[in-house]
């Protein structure tokens, strides 16, 4: 048997080897030097945003400090103007107070930014006046809401007393207003009656119904009768009358004598001589 007569192919591994190298290379692609990591980009972006935010906050804080200094300076100028208008003793006291405030401001500016806390967690960076204002606000909050104060320029309807919601609050409003308004009559009764009371009653009665207005009229009639009675009693008392409205004391009538002696008349008739009149008869008078 000859080796030359047989045909057979020798398997070649070159293609398989090449394919295996290509597959192995595709499994884990290598990053080139110019490729950028996404996590790194996100981290740098966050750092830039944080930096910008910090710069904005620092700028805002600086503007607020500048504004506060300007306001403080203006207050100091107003204080100096006020100092010039007072007497010497008060002027010296105000000057000392202004110097103390200036020293406190300088100390606050000097220690600003140190971030040092004092005893009890107190921040020494905080201005003493600001600390005092906070303490006053805390004390006011602890003691409850302060009552509203009215001035000539304050709208009266903003006061809580003028915002009633039920019958009790309306009665409270009436009891508060009545003595204040009626006391004005002591200062000027003419202005009170012509400029306030009469017109106020009319204005208050405008929204009422007819039945309610009749009740108002009836109430005023009762007051009017009581006033008339009081004035009449005062006049009678002044003229010497009684307190109950009677006339003055009347003069006593002379007493009637009931025990008159009638025997005197009978004795007179008995002493007359009637015989003298016997000669006259009835015919004589015809």
Curated annotation (Swiss-Prot):
Localization terms from the record:
Cytoplasm
One Pfam annotation reads eIF3_subunit
The signal sequence is: none
Tell me the keywords, alphabetical order.
Coiled coil, Cytoplasm, Initiation factor, Protein biosynthesis
Q: What's the name of its gene?
A: HCR1
User: What role is this protein assigned?
Assistant: Component of the eukaryotic translation initiation factor 3 (eIF-3) complex, which is involved in protein synthesis of a specialized repertoire of mRNAs and, together with other initiation factors, stimulates binding of mRNA and methionyl-tRNAi to the 40S ribosome. The eIF-3 complex specifically targets and initiates translation of a subset of mRNAs involved in cell proliferation.
A GO MF annotation of the entry reads: translation initiation factor activity
This chain belongs to the protein called Eukaryotic translation initiation factor 3 subunit J
Q: Which organism is it from?
A: Debaryomyces hansenii (strain ATCC 36239 / CBS 767 / BCRC 21394 / JCM 1990 / NBRC 0083 / IGC 2968) (Yeast)
Can you quote a single GO CC term?
eukaryotic 48S preinitiation complex
